[in-house]
């Protein structure tokens, strides 16, 4: 009888521990007139705070304040300081990749006489 009363007490505490925090959390996410808005978020919006990443705004004032409001000169052509590839060479894969495709007839699979595997162990006996 005592064990049954103990089990009832434990089960009632267990149910209470599950139900009460769930209802408190449900009420915390609702305000008086705006359901689904957290009070902390609402307070931050009223105080002028922001949430998340704030993007940087571009400023074009410095470029226009240069000498006489003229455009900057931009060099044309490849930048030899940072680019070591000559501008007259075409960009293609290295020659060893082309050799694999040109020389397909010389590639043969190993025959039964050539075994693929680890090298034989030296005799240590």
UniProtKB/Swiss-Prot annotation:
GO terms for cellular component: apoplast. The modification Hydroxyproline is found at residues 75, 78. Residues 1-26 form the signal peptide. Keywords: Developmental protein, Differentiation, Glycoprotein, Hydroxylation, Secreted, Signal. Residues 45-125 are annotated as: Disordered. It comes from the Eukaryota. Glycans are attached at residue 78. GO terms for molecular function: receptor serine/threonine kinase binding. The keyword Lipid metabolism does not apply. The keyword S-adenosyl-L-methionine does not apply. One of its GO terms (biological process) is cell-cell signaling involved in cell fate commitment. Belongs to the CLV3/ESR signal peptide family. This is CLAVATA3/ESR (CLE)-related protein ESR3. It comes from Zea mays.
């Amino acid at each position: 009888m005592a064990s049954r009363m103990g089990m009832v007490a434990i089960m009632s505490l267990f149910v209470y521990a599950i139900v009460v925090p769930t209802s408190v959390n449900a009420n915390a996410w609702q305000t008086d007139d705006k359901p689904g808005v957290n009070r902390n978020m609402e307070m931050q919006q009223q105080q002028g705070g922001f949430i998340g990443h704030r993007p940087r705004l571009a400023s074009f004032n410095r470029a226009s304040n240069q000498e006489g409001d003229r455009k900057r000169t931009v060099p044309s052509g490849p930048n030899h300081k940072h680019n070591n590839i000559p501008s007259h060479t075409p960009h293609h894969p290295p020659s060893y990749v082309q050799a694999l495709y040109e020389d397909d007839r010389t590639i043969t699979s190993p025959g039964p006489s050539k075994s693929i595997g680890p090298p034989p162990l030296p005799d240590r006996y």
